[in-house]
Regions:
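Iron-sulfur-cluster electron-transfer modules
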Residues: 1-3, 9-22, 26-30, 218, ...
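Structured core elements
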Residues: 3-5, 47-49, 75-77, 113-114, ...
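Gly-rich Lys/Arg/Thr-decorated short loops/hinges at beta-loop-alpha junctions or inter-strand turns
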Residues: 11-20, 43-44, 80-88, 120-127, ...
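Glycine-rich ThDP/TPP pyrophosphate-binding loop and its adjacent helix/strand module
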Residues: 82-173, 177
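Iron-sulfur cluster-binding cysteine motifs and their immediate structural context
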Residues: 159-160, 165-171, 189-244
């Protein structure tokens, strides 16, 4: 299987999740460790995670070094529209996802693919003029293709930070779907597939007289709705529901 290297940012936590992610670097060194290892490794390709804040700081220099070395590496650049690790500030210089894509193309990256969340509002026609675009449900297929592509490739994953979504929705600055997901505890069997599919911290254990089930913490739910991809009939979708204020 494939492996990924970590870097500086929230995604560093993937190291602790037993998901074949290792090797954090200093800021701006993302992927450069692979440039030295590649000639002596039996592995042909790696992925490198890179946050948009680090990219804006010095990450592009590492990508340019990878292009110059002709390494087989795919940079997975998360554009979450915030310097999330330090409080959700805006990027210096108002960096945008389309600017990142344009810079990657100019730097000589062989193939750039934009991955997007279909629930977010942005000009998809504009992005399709810059690179190939695919919904996030196609991520695994795109990763498999890029892993077999020689040279430097990149995925720009465009999805706003979940914590920032909640903050902006409270101020009316971000689309707020009029829908909430609940779990019917009488149907739920506690298999946990919803958590496997969504990796969402809002799915909490619910102790019942029939054993442990699952419930959704509505106070932290960011309305991602990926939990409903779980193989389970217990989900209830409610339109117009609001959290009761104390």
């Amino acid at each position: 299987g494939s492996i990924a290297y970590a870097g500086i940012g929230c995604h560093t936590m993937a190291i602790w999740m037993d998901r074949a992610t290792d090797g954090p670097t200093h800021m701006g060194g993302e992927g450069v460790n692979w440039l030295g290892q590649a000639p002596f490794s039996n592995r042909n390709h790696v992925f490198q995670n890179l946050g948009d804040g680090t990219y804006n700081h010095s990450g592009l220099l590492a990508i340019r070094a990878a292009v110059a070395s002709s390494a087989n590496i795919t940079y997975k650049i998360l554009f979450n529209d915030a310097v999330a690790m330090t409080g959700g500030q805006s990027h210096e210089g108002e960096l945008s996802a389309d600017e990142i894509i344009t810079e990657l193309n100019s730097a000589g990256v062989k193939r750039v693919v934009g991955i997007f969340d279909e629930k977010e509002e942005f000009d998809l026609d504009h992005y399709r003029k810059l690179c190939e675009m695919a919904p996030r449900s196609e991520l695994m297929r795109i990763q498999e293709q890029l892993a077999s592509t020689s040279g430097v490739t990149a995925i720009v994953y465009i999805q706003t930070c979940a914590a920032e979504k909640r903050r902006r929705r409270k101020r009316g600055l971000f689309p707020d779907p009029d829908r909430r997901i609940f779990i019917n505890s009488e149907v739920c069997e506690g298999c946990g597939d919803c958590g496997v599919k969504s990796n969402c911290v809002s799915i909490r254990p619910a102790e019942t007289e029939l054993g442990r089930k699952r419930k959704i913490d509505q106070s932290s739910c960011n309305k991602d709705f990926s939990c409903v991809s779980g193989f389970c009939p217990s989900f209830v979708s409610v339109i117009g529901a609001e959290i009761k204020k104390k």
